[in-house]
Regions:
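Composition-driven recognition of glycine/serine/threonine/acidic- and proline-rich low-complexity segments
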Residues: 1-176
């Protein structure tokens, strides 16, 4: 999984959500959200994390960072924003390979309780909407990821195919 090189983790595991989980449920103290959109579709991607998990994940990639509590929190949020940005960029590249041009906004940090205000109601009319949640586990703990997808032009996404991208040396996580 290419995400391992962004996180510094040896192995990441995709695990099922708890059986009592409901989309829109608050699962962590913080979340980073980013909007990926184009004329055909929109994806609202969120990575939910607690400070301890985010900090543990950040320290795997950058072990020599300072330990001042306020600075650690800021660095952790910055790291999680960049991780969300990298994942979203990867999603945009996959859609670009399928001739769908999507752009993305700047990642936004919010408190996890704002998840309560998200409407994950599925619709199957002219505008197709659905939500999905998954959990990624590693030696840092776990992250919950949620996505809410709105498809405005269903015909444009019926041909989508995913092929694994070739690994290159320049896929390293960069903080600008």
């Amino acid at each position: 999984m290419q995400t391992c090189q962004f996180t510094g983790c040896d192995a990441l595991e995709l695990v099922d959500m708890d059986s009592d989980y409901i989309l829109g449920q608050v699962v962590s103290r913080q979340m980073i959200l980013i909007l990926i959109s184009g004329t055909e579709m929109k994806i609202l991607l969120k990575i939910h994390f607690n400070d301890s998990e985010g900090n543990s994940l950040r320290r795997k990639k950058f072990p020599d960072q300072p330990t001042d509590a306020q600075l650690v929190t800021a660095k952790t949020v910055d790291y999680m924003k960049e991780l969300t940005n990298q994942v979203s960029g990867r999603i945009c590249r996959i859609f670009q390979l399928n001739n769908l041009s999507l752009g993305m906004c700047i990642p936004l940090n919010m408190h996890g309780f704002y998840e309560l205000y998200t409407d994950y109601t599925a619709e199957d009319g002219m505008l197709k909407k659905f939500g999905q949640a998954w959990k990624i586990k590693g030696d840092f703990g776990s992250l919950v990821c949620t996505a809410y997808v709105e498809i405005m032009e269903p015909a444009a996404v019926t041909h989508l195919q995913y092929t694994e991208e070739q690994k290159t040396d320049d896929d390293e996580l960069e903080f600008l």
